[in-house]
Amino acid sequence: MKEKLKNILIWLLLAGYTVTAVALTDAKYKNIRVTGVSVKIDDNSHNKFISESDIVDVFKKENIKIDNKRMDYVNIHYTENILQDHNKSIRHAEVFRTVYGELGISIEQRQPLMRIINQNGDSYYIDNNGQVMPLSKKYTAHVIVASGYLNEPYMDHVGENMKLRMEKGNKSSGEIIPDLFKLVLTINDSKLWRSQFEQIYVNSKGDIELVPRVGNHIIELGSVEDLDEKLENLDAFYKQGLSQYGWNKYRTISLKYKNQIVCTKRI
């Protein structure tokens, strides 16, 4: 009983400290007015999904008026949530106040890993954390494209995380996108494969094919089962086989069979 009472008292003290700290913080900004907004967007030279004008547009749509507003009246958490909810290219938004009257906004963009184009032409990205994200009208990311016999539309995956589904093996029968996510993660983790593969195709049987930048052939991967082993075998074949016979000798190079590479010659 004493231990339980002790824990309750500690919790009450912490809660009281938090409330006091927030009150003191708000009091510090009581007589300061918002004089301007400073927006910082990370990696803006590489990914250009978001601009400062996009942030301004969200404020206008939500009727968020901050010019000359008292700093202590600015709802920090509400503003952060609004920004993240309205623009799915934003991974994280941090809003903070300064004693100089400037409202700071720091934006972390999502980093696309791959692009999906399904049979109906519906297209979307999956970022490097496995989160599905829509295309942007203002910027196209240069990432691996997966197309072919893919039926899963964007709306079926809104809010889903492919990384978690891949790790838990949580996918329905016939669903292949978590496997494609695993494949692209592996490709991007290798300097060789990152520079070699530019496109993924899923054929009518559900088998995965890789389209290389160098060489007039198709890599028949099949599935992502034993993926590391398959890519190691391909690396050895590239070095020992194609380097001798030429990069355009074969039409297909199949890795589908365990510990085997089966090639189809070009006629």
What are these regions (language model features)?
Residues 1-43, 48, 52-53, 61-87, ...:
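Charged, solvent-exposed interaction patches on well-folded alpha/beta domains
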